[in-house]
Amino acid sequence: MKKRKIVILGAGHVGTHCASSLMFRGFAEEIILIDQDEKKAESQALDLDDMGSCFPYKVTIRAGGYEELQDAQILVNAIGRSRRPGETRLDLFEDSMERLKDVIPKIKKSDFHGILISITNPADVVGECLRRKLG
């Protein structure tokens, strides 16, 4: 049986929390963190992987690159920054799309054909833009 592999773009608060939630629920055998700050992704992955050693099931978490998307079943987009006081989620749209500008070609190049879940704010608008740009 093919093992379930989930890739998370963004190793900040939301991406890392998403990874830990997936680990606790046993939703994947392999979780990959990708972040523009590779050292951050590696650090978060090492901490979470240590925690995973206590689970009654096998789960591996590590940092990786966009080539990991080729055989992933799920991609979670968690790229973005936190809201500042007084900002709405919609105020983050321009910034979120700017951050995704370099990521979209990398996703296309990876030949990813799984499920894309976008939790980058504003999630509904960013998700629709990703759907249109990725086909």
Residue ranges, per PLM feature:
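N-terminal Rossmann-fold NAD(P) dinucleotide-binding loop
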Residues: 15-16
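Extreme N-terminal starter segment of soluble prokaryotic enzymes
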Residues: 2-6
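Conserved S-adenosyl-L-methionine
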Residues: 24-30, 135
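Conserved NAD(P)H cofactor-binding loop of Rossmann-fold oxidoreductase domains
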Residues: 79-81
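Conserved N-terminal Rossmann-fold NAD(P) cofactor-binding segment
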Residues: 36-73
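Rossmann-like NAD(P)(H) cofactor-binding subdomain of soluble oxidoreductases
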Residues: 88-134
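Glycine-rich Rossmann-fold phosphate-binding loop(s) that bind the pyrophosphate
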Residues: 11-12
